Swiss-Prot record:
Mutation effect (P129A): No effect on Vif binding
Taxonomic superkingdom: Eukaryota
Phenotype when changing E141K: Remains sensitive to HIV-1 Vif but abolishes Vif binding
Record text on activity regulation: (Microbial infection) Antiviral activity is neutralized by the HIV-1 virion infectivity factor (Vif), that prevents its incorporation into progeny HIV-1 virions by both inhibiting its translation and/or by inducing its ubiquitination and subsequent degradation by the 26S proteasome.
One Pfam family this sequence matches: NAD2
Protein name per UniProt: DNA dC->dU-editing enzyme APOBEC-3C
Annotated CMP/dCMP-type deaminase domain residues: 29-138
InterPro entries for the chain: APOBEC/CMP_deaminase_Zn-bd (IPR016192), APOBEC_Cyt_Deaminase (IPR050610), CMP_dCMP_dom (IPR002125), Cytidine_deaminase-like (IPR016193)
GO cellular component, one term: P-body
Similarity comment text for this entry: Belongs to the cytidine and deoxycytidylate deaminase family.
Extra remark: It is one of seven related genes or pseudogenes found in a cluster, thought to result from gene duplication, on chromosome 22.
Gene expressing this chain: APOBEC3C
UniProt xrefs under CDD domains: cytidine_deaminase
Source organism: Homo sapiens (Human)
Catalytic activity: a 2'-deoxycytidine in single-stranded DNA + H2O + H(+) = a 2'-deoxyuridine in single-stranded DNA + NH4(+)
Length: 190
């Protein structure tokens, strides 16, 4: 897809996680999307491969690629096989923009052997109809789009953050913002 795309990172630093994934209702100055992923390859009902990693937007002048496109490029070039079923799970700091949502939906329509679940910390420009339509297009392709809850943040902390064995420390407002965002997502998907 795009030869300039970097390979995924293994993890991110704690400060990056707390800044980028905090589920604020209004998240000013968070201009990047971070995407943590797991990929399970399944053959004959057994998990045959397991990949994890982290992508972020590449905003240099050569690639200018959103995190979702970085993942798709890497996945298509290095992982995807027509003889394997895949369960892919994303944990994202922002929900996809309309262009990325459309590209992911088109990819899934062409690859029925790939199932995708997206857990997102925040909804990107959820008040605009085209962003809502992007999320609906993903849902129509069978993608489960969910808002990250405490357990999802904790999972990310334990699996995608250089945490030095420190426990996840939830921030004030996590549960309240989760409920507000979950309701807003439900409204957007109708």
């Amino acid at each position: 897809m795009n030869p300039q795309i970097r390979n995924p990172m293994k993890a991110m630093y704690p400060g990056t996680f707390y800044f980028q994934f905090k589920n604020l209702w209004e998240a000013n100055d968070r201009n990047e999307t971070w995407l943590c992923f797991t990929v399970e390859g399944i053959k004959r009902r057994s998990v045959v491969s397991w990949k994890t990693g982290v992508f972020r937007n590449q905003v240099d002048s050569e690639t200018h690629c959103h995190a979702e496109r970085c993942f798709l490029s890497w996945f298509c070039d290095d992982i995807l096989s027509p003889n394997t079923k895949y369960q892919v799970t994303w944990y994202t700091s922002w929900s996809p923009c309309p262009d990325c949502a459309g590209e992911v939906a088109e990819f899934l329509a062409r690859h029925s052997n790939v199932n995708l679940t997206i857990f997102t910390a925040r909804l990107y420009y959820f008040q605009y109809p085209c962003y809502q339509e992007g999320l609906r297009s993903l849902s129509q392709e069978g993608v489960a789009v969910e808002i990250m809850d405490y357990e999802d943040f904790k999972y990310c902390w334990e699996n995608f953050v250089y945490n030095d064995n420190e426990p996840f420390k939830p921030w004030k407002g996590l549960k309240t913002n989760f409920r507000l965002l979950k309701r807003r997502l439900r409204e957007s998907l109708q």
